[in-house]
């Protein structure tokens, strides 16, 4: 809520209270416009502080594009915004497919800004780490490195190791496993429950 209030104040409206923002968020959740992704709190070898605030997503990424008044050409010209919109779409798809497997999707971020866009967690304790990237070899490499860094911090004496590490991309015709590290690279169109 603090971030939302800061954004509102930066846009010139200082009259909105915390309770008003909370009531709007509650209403948007009730009509299925937004959904929170809860922070994942694994057992780590280090004592790194984990950020436990929820990440809020539009249930349908087209709501964000409509609210911003942008279309495909605008997104092509603003790849940063396109990346945020694509992440919303990807997390929504992961939630739908995870739900079919009686699973949940979380997110992870620590004080050192090591993050994981999605942690797909099943009831049997199995989980996978997912980094969402539009595509391109450099972004895929960055995503794989981030996933491997997080995976290496997990204390496998206290919990299972990840079942998979996956970079979920917006482009590509087929999924593959990187030979150098076993990280899966999966186009969003290849996802299935």
Residue ranges of model-derived segments:
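Accessory nucleic acid-recognition modules appended to NTPase machines
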Residues: 1-126
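Arginine/glycine-rich "motif VI" loop of SF2 helicases in the C-terminal RecA-like domain
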Residues: 97-100, 148-161
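Active-site-adjacent loop/helix micro-motif of nuclease/hydrolase catalytic cores
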Residues: 136-147
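Switch/connector loops and helix/strand junctions flanking conserved nucleotide-binding motifs
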Residues: 66, 139-141, 174-178
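Short beta-strand/turn micro-motifs composed of small residues
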Residues: 109, 167-169
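Active-site ExK catalytic segment of metal-dependent nucleases
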Residues: 127-138
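Short glycine-/polar-rich loops that comprise or flank the Walker A/P-loop
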Residues: 125-127, 160-164
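Domain-level recognition of nuclease-like catalytic cores that cleave nucleotide substrates
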Residues: 170-193
């Amino acid at each position: 809520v603090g971030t939302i209030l800061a954004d509102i104040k930066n846009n010139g409206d200082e009259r909105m209270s915390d309770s008003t923002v909370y009531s709007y968020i509650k209403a948007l959740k009730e009509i299925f416009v937004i959904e929170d992704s809860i922070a994942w709190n694994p057992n780590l070898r280090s004592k790194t502080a984990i950020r436990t605030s929820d990440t809020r997503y539009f249930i349908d990424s087209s709501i964000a594009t409509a609210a911003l008044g942008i279309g495909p050409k605008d997104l092509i010209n603003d790849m940063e915004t396109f990346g945020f919109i694509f992440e919303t779409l990807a997390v929504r798809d992961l939630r739908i497919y995870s739900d079919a497997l009686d699973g949940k999707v979380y997110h992870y971020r620590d004080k050192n800004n090591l993050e994981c866009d999605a942690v797909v967690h099943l009831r049997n304790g199995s989980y996978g780490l997912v980094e969402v990237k539009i595509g391109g070899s450099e972004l895929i490499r960055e995503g794989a490195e981030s996933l491997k860094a997080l995976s290496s911090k997990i204390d496998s004496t206290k919990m299972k190791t990840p079942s998979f590490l996956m970079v979920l991309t917006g482009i590509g015709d087929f999924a593959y496993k990187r030979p150098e590290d076993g990280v899966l690279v999966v186009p969003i169109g290849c996802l299935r429950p």
